[in-house]
UniProtKB/Swiss-Prot annotation:
It comes from Sinorhizobium fredii (strain NBRC 101917 / NGR234). This is Uncharacterized protein y4sG. It comes from the Bacteria. Residues 123-323 form the ATP-grasp domain. Signal peptide: none annotated. It holds the Pfam family Dala_Dala_lig_C.
Length: 336
């Protein structure tokens, strides 16, 4: 089958530079290497692949690679890794283009990506579904009332991913500066939520009508300087927080975490695969921090570690995601 792997490794394919750009993370940025790994995995299963940019030329590129079939049969699919170039709700841009063009693709719809992109909406949906999530407030000045919040608090952009801008604030006097940094650097509101001191657990999910919960991953933060998984802690620190998979969690709590994670997946309208990030407080009470509708697929990521612990190879995971998406569209899988 023809599979186009779409990512954003260059940020030049636009008509104008307009709107908030995707934050440029500290280098090296792994996106291009991940796309190459996905291409190789798809080729292992015999797929004809094309690696292309999720920019203004995408539909022209796809039409050449997978031209319309005269009998209206599917001419190919997209494995979507595109996180967007600029503007609002960037994760929705490529899926929206593909919806309009009639090209099937892996991962969440524009709706699903939009709901998870907006942390306020996703946390509200969680609460409405009975999923516990830390108390929070939205701020633009840092002088708003904090009467409903317990310090320390975590301050982060309302819409960004990859732990961009994540800050831990211990005292109300520090809050204004932290909020100002978010508003100035990222041109959006700051989400201020209560910090949950305890274990950090990531839960990888695969599927749709039936969702497979992969073995849980725990980040061992006890000996690590940073109490938060910031971008720097995850990707640039000399010693990164070690991960344990499967996490050592007693049976009753593990069942609760699985149920909470699937409920979050469904509340936020995710598809095919996602990752739910939780904290367990010192009493063992779980809180969902957020859900990632396009979790990282690098060979060192928590999602891939969970899949490999479940018995997948990297290739079988990538082709399994494609198979799940194909089954969602057409009622049958590719893998048989």
């Amino acid at each position: 089958m023809r599979i186009a792997v779409v990512c954003n490794s260059a940020f030049t394919g636009v008509i104008n530079r307009f709107g908030q750009p995707y934050p440029q993370p500290p280098q090296p940025w792994p996106q291009g290497r991940i796309a190459d790994s996905v291409v190789a995995a798809l080729q292992e299963c015999g797929h004809e692949t094309l690696l292309c940019e999720g920019d203004k030329g995408l539909l022209t590129t796809l039409e050449r690679f997978m031209p319309p079939d005269p009998l209206a049969r599917t001419s190919g699919m997209v494995f979507n890794l595109a996180e967007g170039i600029q503007g609002e709700y960037r994760f929705t841009h490529v899926p929206a283009m593909l919806e309009m063009a009639g090209v099937p693709y892996t991962g969440s719809s524009p709706l699903g990506h939009g709901l998870t992109d907006d942390k306020v909406i996703s946390k509200t949906l969680m609460r409405d579904s009975g999923v516990p999530t830390p108390n929070f407030s939205i701020m633009r000045r840092g002088t708003e009332s904090t009467d409903d919040l317990r310090f320390p608090v975590v301050v982060k952009p309302r819409h960004e991913d990859n732990s961009f801008g994540l800050q831990l604030v211990h005292e109300p006097a520090q809050l204004q500066q932290a909020v100002k940094m978010i508003v100035t650097k990222y041109a959006q509101d700051a989400l201020v939520e209560e910090y949950i001191d305890g274990r950090e657990i990531h839960v990888a999910l695969l599927g749709n009508q039936e969702v497979e919960v992969l073995p849980m991953v725990e980040f061992e933060l006890g000996e690590h300087e940073a109490p938060l998984l910031t971008w720097e802690a995850k990707y640039l620190a000399a010693v990164q927080p070690p991960k344990t998979c499967p996490a050592k969690i007693e049976s009753k709590l593990a069942t609760l975490l699985r149920d909470i994670s699937v409920a979050t997946f469904r509340a936020c309208q995710c598809r095919d695969y996602a990752r739910v990030d939780l904290r367990l407080d010192r009493s063992g009470q779980p809180f969902v921090l957020e859900i990632n509708s396009m979790p990282g697929l690098s060979t060192h990521s928590a999602y891939v570690l969970a899949a490999m612990t479940a018995g997948h190879s990297y290739s079988s995971l990538i082709n399994g995601i494609l198979d799940v998406a194909h089954r969602r569209y057409f009622g049958n899988g590719i893998l048989g």
